Each structure stands twice: as structure tokens, then as C-alpha cells.
């Protein structure tokens, strides 16, 4: 039977991608349905109990700047907050928070259940309704059919998921949850390229069986960082430390002696695992010169005794896992409460997607998260938001939107996936971005909130706060530009105590702030430049904008030069065999990838600068030279 009411957008899957997609579509005013196999697992952290990190924290801030959920949820659930790379420049500083799994899931569910235009329904999905290469709905396990104008697939590791512990394996979407086999079979019937990937998770340890007294503690930062631009440290629950232990030669001997029982090394697992989150077996074999690996013991929550040993992801048999755990300092009597495992699952080649994350072949069908070959909560959330907003725009018959590489890490992520594809789980790093000085955590709102407001993602409270911040920044910069001191100023001695070289000529507040030794806090502690802004976010922007003004201007020039090619559009229906002068290899690659722009084409492996020049000349001759706005 058909459900009586049609929807604008259906989201299939309630993980980090699905929840952001559902919230985004609903915020835009679209009637949205979130289908999940279990309402109690909405927003569940399937692996590590943490949000953020290098590159990942940047994505979380961007999701927040667009009105998303993840940053707000972790501010209510984070039990240890830190700024990574705090001693380095602002481009690579990143926020990371340990999470209480229960509080995080609770924050996500509360937000979903209170979001207007959003209905949640508990049923696994077995099929899509596709008519004339256009998705028009979904069919649940019990045969109930839902109609919609757009569908977003955010199914994580559930598509034909297979869990491995030692040489034993069984079907599962994750530990304790069934896989999605009928849907996987249905998707394999569509004209989409599909392959397998693998990820893994470590065993969980009973904290009561660990001797923490012999281990080093790792505390969070004080003052505590905040993730959301709308957040406050007052929202954070009680903070707790993590602990550090290490593997040793005994650990490594146990692993080497049991490799024949590893499903990876025995050839049982076909899927490729994440390069930047390798299993402990991989670490020991790939880094044979290392006699120890650092392991972080991370609490799973304030009311839980479970500890997540970050760094020993494994699919070795349970008896070997016990030996590995008990070989480490402080863990000699440790008990495992959940075994580690590896999981294989289907993913679909993201090169078959438009930058909006809509399928090139099935209209109205969007993909987000691990189904696109990524790994990580943050990467999933960012894709989910983008897919959700574009599904909403599609259902409203509006043009899709995707950020550029110079606009957001989300733009880098999507461009990498859609242009280059991936053969291993893709993780975001700051090193993947060419313009990372422009793509900082601290300015994510300045880059994206205005766009989010235009698309209906940003509510009135966030918009008012954003505009207040802009006004504070401009007012303070104007004040510092127009406030001057000279060597004869009465307070010059006070100023000179903070400078490496005495003041020798007239200088404005901005001139002094540009000096490496001067911070905004120091400058505004001087009587000539007091008082400081009460708005800490605006104050941070003032300091960064002034200190890095020259570098930022130079990078902006680079972006503008690159933008000409980036925005030159390529017809979606172009058969590159029509373009004289292109090699057979280039023709094959362009016809295979179908890039949306010259910029995207230039990043395809094997596409030479000469080929790009030929394309530009041909487009001009044919009267097809068009640039996007």
C-alpha cells in the first residue's frame, strides 16, 4: 500500500549524514520523511566517541555555519574539548571533542523530533521506486510505499554489510544491527558503479579493570573551546580526562604470530580499508621499525564504564584481542566488553554524481556519507547537509548548489570525490585544500552563513548573531585603524614594554597588531587602545584579519585567477569525440567523468594543460564558452 501523504524529500538512514540531510531539507520548508531501521539509533556513534580533529573540525564548523546540527550536538555532549595544532597558524588549528555517546544521540534525537516539516518513521527500506530514470519513492520492509520528489541515500556501512572477527564472519550493518541486503541488491541493478570498502573498530574495555594509576592523563583545554558559533562553554557537561598507554614488543609479537588468523592477511576481506586509520595489524606490519604505538584510552560517557582504546582497531580473533589488550601497561587485567571487528560494505563510485551529490543517471536520487566512499562522522555530516539541501532545492524545482574548493572544505571534499573518485575510504585533511589560509575554522561562518541564509538553512537567531559579529569586526577594525600613537605619546613606555623594538614612528592600532609579538589581548590592555571587544569571536577575527592581511590578499588573487577556468562550464551532453585535437586517452577520460567545468576537468588524472587549451578554443569557436555566476 501507499502511505496516504506524499513527501518532498525522503532520507533513507539515520546516521550522521541522514540526520543532517533530514534537518537541512526540513529547515528549507520541504515536507521531509526520515526512514530508519531503528529510531533508537538516530545519530549513533558507531565507532569512536569523538567529533572533530584536523580537517574534520573544519567540516563541523562549516556544517554549523550552514545551520547544521553536529556542532550544537557535540557542545551538549562533549566531555573533553581541545584545540589541536594550537601553537601553529590559524589555518590548521582544529577543534576536537570527546563525546558522551548517550548525550550526543539524545541531542540529535531531540533536535530531529522538534524540527518542523520532519516526520520520522521506523522501517528498513528494501527498494526504490524508479520511473523513467527518475526516483519517485521508496518501499519499506513491510511493503509500505512512500512517494517523494527526491530521495537521499545515507545508508552507511549497511549495504550488504559483512562483519569479520577472525576467520568467522556474518551479515550485519554494524555490531547488533542487521544489514540492508535487499536494498543493496536493488541498487546493484541500477546503472551505477559499485565496489566494496572495509572499516574496523577496536574492542571496548571495562574501565573498572584498567589500572589508570600507572598511566599518563590527558586533560582538555582551559578555557574550554566551543564548536558551534551559537554555542557556549556553559552547555558542556562535566569534563573528564583521557589516558595514554602504548603497545610494546610483546603486543607486536602476539600480532605477528597470529597473522594467519587475520581475515585481512588471510585474504578473506576483499574491501580496502582506511589508509589514515589502519588496524593494529597493519600498523605493526607497515611500520616494522616502530617498537611502540601510542594508544589513547577514551571514555565513552559519563555514565558508562566502557573505554574506547583509540589505536587498536582489529579484526583478529577474540582470544588474540584479549592477548593484545592485556599486553599493554595498565591493561594487564583488562576485560573486553565488546570485541573489535572489521566490516565490509558496498559503496558507489562518487564520479557518477554531480557536485550537488545527485546521481548523473537517476534524477532526484542523492547519495551522502560512506556510500560515497568516505570515512568519518564529519565527512558524512557535511555530505548529508549538502545532499539534503540539494534534494530540497530539487523538489522545489530550484537549481542545485555546491561550494567551490576556495569556498569550503566541503567544496574540496565533493570535488575530490566527484572528479577523482576514491579506491579507499576518503578522510579529510587540511593538506587536501589549496587555499587553506582562506578555509579556517574561525571564518566558516563568514564564508557560508550568508549563502545558508539565502537557501533557507539559517534561522533568524543565527542570522542576527552573524550580523552582530560582522558589525563588531568592522567597528573594531575601524577603531584600531583610526587610533594612533607616536614616540612622544604619554603611554609610549607602556607600549614599548610589549614590543621587541621601541616605537620609532607614528603607528595605528592595526600597525601594532601586525607585529608578531603583539596579540589583540595585549594591545587592548594598553590604555591607548582599550577597551577590548566583549565578543570573543569578533576579537579573534580582528586579530587574524590584521595579522594575515597580506597573505590573505595574495591567496585571494590566486583564487580569482583560478576562478576563470573553474567557472567555465562544459555541456553535460558533450561527446568529446567531437573536439578535434584531443588524444584518445583524454577523450575516453572526459567522456567517462563528464566534468561539469574546465576546472573540474583539469583535476582529472591524465588531462594535460594542452588538452584544456584545446577545449577552451573549441568552446569559443562553437559559441559555447559560458561561465557560471
Curated annotation (Swiss-Prot):
Binding site for NAD(+): 273-287
Record GO cellular component, one term: cytosol
Source taxon at top rank: Bacteria
PROSITE patterns the UniProt entry points to: GIDA_1, GIDA_2
Protein's UniProt keywords contain Metal-binding: no
Cofactors, names only: FAD
InterPro entries: FAD/NAD-bd_sf, GIDA_C_N, MnmG, MnmG-rel, MnmG-rel_CS, MnmG_C, MnmG_C_subdom, MnmG_C_subdom_sf
Binding site residues for FAD: 13-18, 125, 180, 370
NCBIfam families, per the entry: mnmG_gidA
Protein's UniProt name: tRNA uridine 5-carboxymethylaminomethyl modification enzyme MnmG
Organism of provenance: Cronobacter sakazakii (strain ATCC BAA-894) (Enterobacter sakazakii)
